[in-house]
Amino acid sequence: MQNGDVRTIQGLKIEAVPAYNIVHMRSGRTPFHPKGPGNGYVITFADKRVHVAGDTENTPEMKRLKNIDIAFLPMNLPYTMTPQMVADAAKAFKPKILYPYHYGQTDPNMLVNLLKRSKNIEVRIRNMR
């Protein structure tokens, strides 16, 4: 699917959300993930909307999402988001449940602390080891 495409496959509505880097770059200012080829997806299952972000940062397209029940956001430096970027994205589109993933050595409790006042966002941490 191309950035922005929407398809229905076997009863599931799938929306392609551009996934790319804005801040984190390779040497020479080349993004780890340039805009264009990569997507995250919003998948609608009956009345539930799930966002799986892919390898991305807190892009304007992500921050404009609406009515997300569950979000999976990457938190892996230098390729994706810092805990602060994940918190910024979550505060913008307000998923009911947030699972950080891909976080490797980043302490997920940093994200929990950043969102502790966001009472309508439940952060769920799973052991990645």
Outline where the language-model segments fall.
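Core dinuclear metal-dependent hydrolase active-site scaffold
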Residues: M1-K66, R126-R129
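Binuclear metal-ion centers of metallo-dependent hydrolases, dominated by the metallo-beta-lactamase
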Residues: M1-V6, A87, K91-R129
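Active-site environment of divalent metal-dependent phosphoester hydrolases
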Residues: D5-T8, I22, E57-E61, P78-P83, ...
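Short, glycine/charged-enriched secondary-structure capping and boundary segments
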Residues: R29-T30, E57, L65-I68, M85-A89, ...
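Proline-rich intrinsically disordered, low-complexity coils
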Residues: P31-P37, P78, P83, P95, ...
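Broad hydrophobic/π-residue packing in well-ordered secondary structure
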Residues: Y41-I43, H51-V52, Y79, Y103-T106, ...
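Short glycine/proline-enriched coil/turn segments at helix->beta-strand junctions
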Residues: A46-K48, K66-D69, K94, K119-N120
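Proline-aspartate-enriched helix->loop->beta-strand connector
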Residues: I68-L73, L77-P100
